[in-house]
Amino acid sequence: MIRRIFTSSFITVLLSFAAYSAYAQEKPLLGYNKLKTYVSYFNAIDTETVKNYVTNDHAYNWMAKNIPLFECPDSAIQKIYYYRWWTFRKHLKQTPDGFIFTEFITPVKFTGVYNSSSSALGHQIYEGRWLHDPQYINDYIKFWLYVDPKQKKPHLHTFSSWIDDAVYNYYLVNNDKKFIEQVIPALNTDYRQWEAEKQLPSKLFWQFDVRDAMEESISGSRIVKNKRPTINSYMYGNAVALSKMASLLGIDSVKNKYSKKAIELKKLVQDSLWNDSASFFQVRRPDGSFADAREELGFIPWYFKLPDDKPAYAKQWDQLTDEKGFNAPWGITTAERRHPLFRTHGTGHGCEWDGAVWPFATTQTLKGLAVLLTNYQNKGSMTPAVFYNELHKYALSHIKRGVPYLGEYQDEKTGYWLKGDNPRSSYYNHSGFCDLVINDLVGLKPRADNMLEVFPLIPQNQWKWFALDNVLYHGQRISILWDKTGSKYHKGKGFIIYIDGKPIMRCAKLKHVLLKMPV
């Protein structure tokens, strides 16, 4: 088994825990009052027309047992953090084949057994990896790998997926090697199935936009086999993840096979899907021409750290903050606003991806931006302030008629939810938010080794305090506090990290740190 872990060079804070002994934290540092207040409010404004495994009456108790606690001065981000966990548990469904998470709160005719849908599977695993009880996500992953394939009409391949990448990143949180050992044969089989179904002789993958869950797009088609940054980035991320999982298990033949596939696909994406004249990753048609639109899907390669660390690629991100590009009052548009076909495919009759704001894509783009800011030297014009402002805008967008709401997609100028009051759209489980707060804003970076890494993307002087508490990571409780003056939490000034209730790091500045955890 290969156990060597490579880390990038950066300034670290390295502490030894040779004398550290396990300490059971009796209660979270933050307490549960804020959680209880939010749940009471969300319950009060809800009609609860659909009840699944965790009803509103049990929402507080379930959340108290399962979610990390969070507090910050940004009331929008804080409120929506708890709202998103509250809505997420609405979709937890107990079936004869174990737990699953639904996408639509009401039954939809084009879904699979138990109203299952795979389009946002990657988002759901990333979000759910922070739940304390692993049974929910374990069951959900096994549902797609073992239950869905036995159906008369399997649905996993109805949509492109980054399931392997999500499973590996789930492992990085809970360190459950046995689970990886159980599922890697099925993941390996699934990858081969994608190759058989969607891989071209060039070794790139093709996909219809509707099968990327991005229909009615400017560049896409329901009949033309376009080479898209979406599925090719996903398959790259899946290959990298399979290589790492195989390495973890000491299966060198599988590790080497997928490492080779990842290297090959990375080169193909950069050589074939990068349009130098547009400075953007774009869809390429079968005739070799590029679609003439910059679309938000062009940011997806960074989600998986695919692009090389070069200024030419980083330049693409300038479009994110350009009002003629993707910057709109209510969020990040799915196509550049300057394009003549922007928002021309109608509104609300289907699922139009020709410019409206989709939380699904916003999640991908913000994750990609976080990867750029924390893993690349060449960041272009991007800064933590850009990430923070976009996340704040994303939080503010969760509103309808003055109360918290999560739907399918929005008008970029007014914030109107384009499916209106369609019942299927309420609490739409098709994106992520809590993971963006934990993993990217606060910056808890799960790792395969015995290190605790925190890389905050909170701009300097943005907040005087915040706390992320009760995070279950590698079987231990993690708390991350920032208290500039020491007057908020009364535990001292500065940046403080706790493991199982004991402070193990203090420093004056909010910065990137790397700590050795107890064995």
Language-model segments: what does each one mean?
Residues 1-26:
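Bacterial Sec-dependent N-terminal signal peptides
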Residues 59, 63-75, 122-133, 163-179, ...:
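Well-ordered alpha-helical scaffold segments within catalytic/enzyme domains
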Residues 27-51, 58-61, 150-161, 195-261, ...:
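The feature captures the catalytic groove of carbohydrate-active enzymes
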Residues 23-112, 172, 177-179, 188-193, ...:
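Acidic/polar, glycine-enriched structural segments that form the non-catalytic walls/loops
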Residues 462-496, 500:
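Carbohydrate-binding surface patches
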Residues 26-31, 76-79, 83-90, 101, ...:
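Substrate-binding cleft of carbohydrate-active enzyme catalytic domains
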Residues 76-113, 130-153, 196-227, 267-359, ...:
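Extended glycan-interaction surfaces of carbohydrate-active proteins
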Residues 245, 249-283, 314-476:
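Non-catalytic carbohydrate-binding regions of carbohydrate-active enzymes
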